[in-house]
From Swiss-Prot:
Known outcome of mutating residue 161 to A: Loss of activity
Protein's UniProt name: Argininosuccinate lyase
Mutagenesis or variant effect for residue 29 to A: 10% decrease in catalytic efficiency
Gene source species: Anas platyrhynchos
Effect of residue 11 to M: 99% decrease in catalytic efficiency
EC number(s) on file: 4.3.2.1
Reaction(s) the record says it catalyses: 2-(N(omega)-L-arginino)succinate = fumarate + L-arginine
Family assignment from sequence similarity: Belongs to the lyase 1 family. Argininosuccinate lyase subfamily.
Gene: ASL2
Record's function text: Delta crystallin, the principal crystallin in embryonic lens, is found only in birds and reptiles. This protein also functions as an enzymatically active argininosuccinate lyase.
Alphabetized UniProt keyword annotations: Amino-acid biosynthesis, Arginine biosynthesis, Eye lens protein, Lyase
Comment field (misc): Each of the four substrate-binding sites present in the homotetrameric assembly are shared between three of the four subunits.
Length: 468
């Protein structure tokens, strides 16, 4: 009875005793890796063709295997595939079903192939597809930020450092600051995709494939860019998983920052913007509440992604060479982060595209003290060394505070008492449009500079879209 219990395992021949039920539960991954069903079939079809070319399968056998795999694919797509208790993973499930459909010929499919090279191939195929979708959503978010910046380029609001009012900026400059960060994420994603695009299939358990399998044929069939150089490395390396999770971590840092900014700006204390009802929720007790749950969830999901990266790093750091069962942990991390990014990016795009800004409240929040730097720059343009100009401007701020007035209300005599370089044209300093318009250097908040940023980002997005 014990040996029969092992007979349905791909590895059961060597064992005489049955597996402990608790061990069965711990060992099984079919509950989540069935998401690999389609790519597992895709890989098996390619491998079957390579076996036929190598003379392991006859043409008739190949046709039966391909037909059976197509039937299994159809069952998965229709949601009628029946997973059995003995199916410990997606590879076992598909092979078991193939045998039910075409008989013992199914047993030839795994010739020279190990689940070690099979599973990493499946995961890479899954990630190739998923990362293309994520890339599309990411570029759409960047585009939404850029196009909104172009439309609302004339809106000016306070810029903050340390959450204290600092200098006037354009609302567009704020939007583009987040767009630029996301373009770096898009570039990083492109690099991850390059590393994923290396074929491991044909590496066997660790020593390679002894059956003269045409790996170039496999590469072409599965649309990989290149072939792995070393079989031991190919079946065990999960650098691409770590790189993907690292990319995701940085992306979520940027999205969390943007979410936090927008949450603050949406408070009644700031009143700079209002979120759409479509991306807000209410309170079960307080009828007046409109909560920015969409942004709060984006912010919180960052911690979830960070945890996935940390867990995989901990799994990998102590492993010896080649495959170890520890690597089974990679799939849940990848699936979870793929799902998280897919949802978060779409919600973020929805938030940005539908929020309403209050130009009036933004402009009301601008205060003369924010022009203290401009006052110092006024003196610099008069030939005063910056350190002296900075000190003079600070004294002007202090004098205004002492008098209980704003800095722009200081008389010319007051200013001259601080520096003789002040003259009647100093009044031009106390204008918020003039303030932002002086930052004409590349990357600045002047309208001309912001327009250049928009043009550059549009061009960059075009290139990244072509490479996606």
């Amino acid at each position: 009875m014990a040996s029969e219990a092992r007979g349905d395992k791909l590895w059961g021949g060597r064992f005489s005793g049955s597996t402990d039920p608790i061990m069965e539960k711990l060992n099984s991954s079919i509950a989540y890796d069935q998401r690999l069903s389609e790519v597992d079939i895709q890989g098996s079809m390619a491998y079957a063709k390579a076996l036929e070319k190598a003379g392991i399968l006859t043409k008739t056998e190949l046709e039966k295997i391909l037909s059976g795999l197509e039937k299994i694919s159809e069952e998965w797509s229709k949601g009628v595939f029946v997973v059995k208790q003995s199916d410990e993973d997606i590879h076992t499930a598909n092979e078991r079903r193939l045998k039910e459909l075409i008989g013992d010929i199914a047993g030839k499919l795994h010739t020279g192939r190990s689940r070690n090279d099979q599973v990493v191939t499946d995961l890479k195929l899954f990630m190739k597809n998923s990362l293309s979708i994520i890339s599309t959503h990411l570029l759409q978010l960047i585009k939404t930020l850029v196009e909104r910046a172009a439309i609302e380029i004339d809106v000016i609001l306070p810029g903050y450092t340390h959450l204290q009012k600092a200098q006037p900026i354009r609302w567009s400059q704020f939007l583009l600051s987040h767009a630029v960060a996301l373009t770096r994420d898009s570039e990083r994603l492109g690099e991850v995709k390059k590393r994923i695009n290396v074929l491991p299939l044909g590496s066997g358990a660790l020593a390679g494939n002894p059956l003269d399998i045409d790996r170039e044929m496999l590469r072409s069939e599965l649309e990989f860019a290149s072939i792995s150089l070393n079989s031991m490395d190919a079946i065990s390396e999960r650098d691409f998983v770590v790189e993907f999770l690292s990319f995701a971590t940085l992306l979520m840092i940027h999205l969390s920052k943007m979410a936090e900014d927008l949450i603050i700006y949406s408070t009644s204390e700031f009143g700079f913007l209002t979120l759409s009802d479509a991306f807000s929720t209410g309170s079960s007790l307080m009828p007046q509440k409109k909560n920015p749950d969409s942004l709060e969830l984006i912010r919180s999901k960052a911690g979830r992604v960070f945890g996935r990266l940390a867990s995989i790093l901990m799994v990998l750091k102590g492993l010896p060479s080649t495959y170890n069962k520890d690597l089974q942990e990679d799939k849940e991390a990848v699936f979870d982060v793929v799902d998280t990014l897919t949802a978060v990016l779409q919600v973020a795009t929805g938030v940005i595209s539908t929020l309403q800004i209050s130009k009036e409240n933004m402009e009301k929040a601008l205060t003369p003290e924010m022009l203290a730097t401009d006052l110092a720059l006024y003196l610099v343009r008069k030939g005063v060394p910056f350190r002296q100009a900075h000190t003079a401007s600070g004294k002007a701020v202090h004098l205004a505070e002492t008098k209980g007035i704003t800095i722009n209300k200081l008389s010319l005599e007051d200013l001259k008492s601080i520096s003789p370089q002040f003259s009647s044209d100093v009044s031009q300093v106390f204008n918020f449009v003039n303030s932002v318009e002086q930052y004409t250097a590349l990357a600045g908040t002047a309208k001309s500079s912001v327009t250049t940023q928009i043009e550059q980002l549009r061009e960059l997005m075009k290139k990244q879209k072509e490479q996606a």
